[in-house]
Amino acid sequence: MSDLDEDLLALAGADESEEEDQVLTTTSAKRAKNNDQSLSKKRRIEVGSVEDDDEEDDYNPYSVGNADYGSEEEEEANPFPLEGKYKDESDREHLESLPEMERETLLFERSQIMQKYQERKLFRARGRDMKEQQQRAKNDEDSRKTRASTRSTHATGHSDIKASKLSQLKKQRARKNRHYSDNEDEDDEEDYREEDYKDDEGSEYGDDEEYNPFDRRDTYDKREEVEWAEEEDEQDREPEISDFNKLRIGRSFVAKFCFYPGFEDAVKGCYGRVNVGTDKRTGKTSYRMVRIERVFLQKPYNMGKFYTNQYFGVTQGKDRKVFQMNYFSDGLFAEDEYQRYLRALDNSQMIKPSLHSLSNKTKEVMDFVNTPLTDKTTDEVVRHRMQFNKKLSGTNAVLEKTVLREKLQYAKETNNEKDIAKYSAQLRNFEKRMSVYEKHHENDQSDIKKLGELTSKNRKLNMSNIRNAEHVKKEDSNNFDSKSDPFSRLKTRTKVYYQEIQKEENAKAKEIAQQEKLQEDKDAKDKREKELLVAQFRRLGGLERMVGELDIKFDLKF
């Protein structure tokens, strides 16, 4: 080995530590610089991701109500655990003892409460499922981020060691040529920048996984796939009584929506619980589950607060009948009514409706109910209602006046001068018609008063006639011979014996007195006749008359 080689080795060995320190210092400085750049990039990315998340949260349908579910961990108690209508057996007995109208009203209110309870229960269950899915997705993202950062760290460390050794080798060989060494230094710096940029770029991609909106969309897609699969499984089952109860049309629904446009199409295919009378064996009201086929227009009838001419044409199997809408109950279908309807379908060889068709019809009814009211729709509702309810008093007047006021208020809020003038004039005309109607009604009070007086007079006359008829009937009954009717009640009188004896004695004494009086009268009459006869002889020549009446025969012979 020559002295030159030894000098080179010595120089290489002596400068090795310095070069290593220099290389390590340069590498650490560059790494710190690159780390600062990557951290600044990460900060910018994280800020952007937070903003993106905030923007996405505004449109996230699954984030609604999540904050409320944390405080509602405890399950809400079922308000009506017995058949979904009663609190207990005593409550059932109390409801069945009430009048039909009051019972049906309470059952309808309880059905609304149960529907809200089921919705809250479903929302809580969905909220819990969403929170669990979000937690699982977050854990998966954290684990994926940890693995990605670990891989990035290992790769970066390996490349740094390799680059440091390579730079040392190059710098040892660059002692012979300074120019080549300078060029190699520039290449090394470019290599360091490229490798550090690749490392930072890899870390940025790792950070991109934290805020990538497509990950959220993929999560939603997975959830939708799961929910769609659950819905398909749900649609495969047989329909139950609860599914039919969702399509039940009652008296309250009819009273609210019967004048709305599209009501006939909405109720077609729904189900109802119709009152068919009283059961002779139990004495309770009997109901039947029927399917509404169409709406008929016939003679108007009273629905309670208004008149309508709409009738429901219903079927149970092959049996068809037309009912007034006020015969439909707001109560839920009972199990025996549901089974009776299924037996009617089987006897008629008709197919039971599928759950898919029931769900579609339920959505159609909900769309009809949730349709917003427009000016045109409101005018049509009022026009249909006024067809058989033309009086200005009562509910119709209140409804029409309320509609006009709402239209006027909306016109004032929108500063529409044309509509303000229009609805103000209509409201004034309506109030004028109301005042005219009230005055006319006051003028009719006199006629009503006269009619009332005439009615009262006729009522009194009828009462007197009835009283006389009852008196005549009573007299006839007194004169009626009870012996002719063997089934009549025998009338008895209390008999006091000493009074009867006294009466008999009085009668005998009276008879004796009458006889004595007759005898005295006879004696007095005979006495008067004798006195008269004596007087005739004395004063009226009675002797001469008697002599003249004597028939004396003389026989004279000469």
UniProtKB/Swiss-Prot annotation:
- Per the record, residues carrying Phosphotyrosine are Y69
Q: Where is the composition biased (Basic and acidic residues)?
A: 84-107, 119-145
A single BP term in Gene Ontology: positive regulation of transcription elongation by RNA polymerase I
Show the PROSITE patterns listed in the entry: PLUS3
Write out the biased-composition intervals (Acidic residues). 49-59, 183-212
Main location group: nucleus
| Cellular compartment(s) | Nucleus, Nucleoplasm
> What remark does the entry add?
Present with 6510 molecules/cell in log phase SD medium.
Record-linked PANTHER family: RNA POLYMERASE-ASSOCIATED PROTEIN RTF1 HOMOLOG
Could you tell me what this protein does? The PAF1 complex is a multifunctional complex. Involved in transcription initiation via genetic interactions with TATA-binding proteins. Involved in elongation. It regulates 3'-end formation of snR47 by modulating the recruitment or stable association of NRD1 and NAB3 with RNA polymerase II. Also has a role in transcription-coupled histone modification. Required for activation of RAD6 ubiquitin conjugate and the BRE1 ubiquitin ligase which ubiquitinate 'Lys-126' histone H2B.
Specify the protein name: RNA polymerase-associated protein RTF1
Organism of provenance: Saccharomyces cerevisiae (strain ATCC 204508 / S288c)
